[in-house]
């Protein structure tokens, strides 16, 4: 009973914003999400490092929950799909914004993300029983993080990327990276507060 809904969160059960991402309706539901995570999760973990990857995953999961309680507070939603869509958004954004800075093989893998994202969005809108807000909330957070955050300095020598023509792109200082994560988290907290005011 760890689903997220506006009424439950308004009753003080804030933990549902995160717990819902670790529960699934049935075996097929969890298998599909884990398969999607298996496809591109390891590559994103390599790009951002284990700690940042975990932070991104949790923020995307929270993004799906927060948009759900904002837009459809009566909905009861569970599943990791918001986080999965967030990772898709992250991969799409970083592959577009940092295209030349990524290794060739990484570019090839991430180049397929656009098609995968389009297919999953089609399922989101046309298959009954799917939390549209959960998917879109996670996607929005992932797109923002992917656009603002270059891959972690741990991914390349001295936090730099060698690109075509020999140019070098410096990595983002850790303090700025932390500020981005805290800023997104703050927006999610603010969104939750607005949702609670609307329900009250």
Q: Over which residues does each language-model region extend?
A:
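Membrane-interfacial alpha-helical segments at the cytosolic side of multi-pass membrane proteins
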Residues: 31-52, 58, 86-99, 140-153
């Amino acid at each position: 009973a760890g689903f997220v809904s506006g009424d439950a969160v308004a009753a003080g059960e804030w933990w549902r914003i995160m717990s819902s991402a670790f529960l699934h309706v049935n075996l097929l539901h969890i298998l599909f999400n884990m398969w999607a995570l298996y496809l591109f999760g390891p590559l994103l973990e390599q790009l951002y490092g284990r700690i940042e990857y975990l932070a991104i995953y949790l923020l995307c999961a929270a993004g799906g929950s927060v948009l759900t309680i904002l837009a459809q507070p009566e909905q009861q939603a569970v599943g990791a799909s918001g986080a999965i869509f967030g990772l898709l958004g992250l991969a799409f954004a970083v592959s577009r914004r940092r295209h030349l800075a990524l290794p060739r093989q990484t570019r090839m893998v991430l180049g397929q993300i656009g098609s995968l994202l389009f297919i999953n969005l089609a399922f989101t809108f046309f298959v009954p029983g799917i939390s549209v807000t959960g998917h879109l909330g996670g996607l929005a957070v992932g797109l923002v993080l992917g656009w603002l955050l270059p891959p972690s300095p741990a991914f390349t020598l001295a936090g730099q990327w060698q690109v075509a023509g020999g140019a070098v792109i410096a990595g983002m200082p850790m303090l700025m990276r932390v500020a981005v994560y805290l800023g997104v988290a703050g927006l999610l907290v603010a969104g939750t507060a607005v949702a609670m005011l609307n329900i009250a």
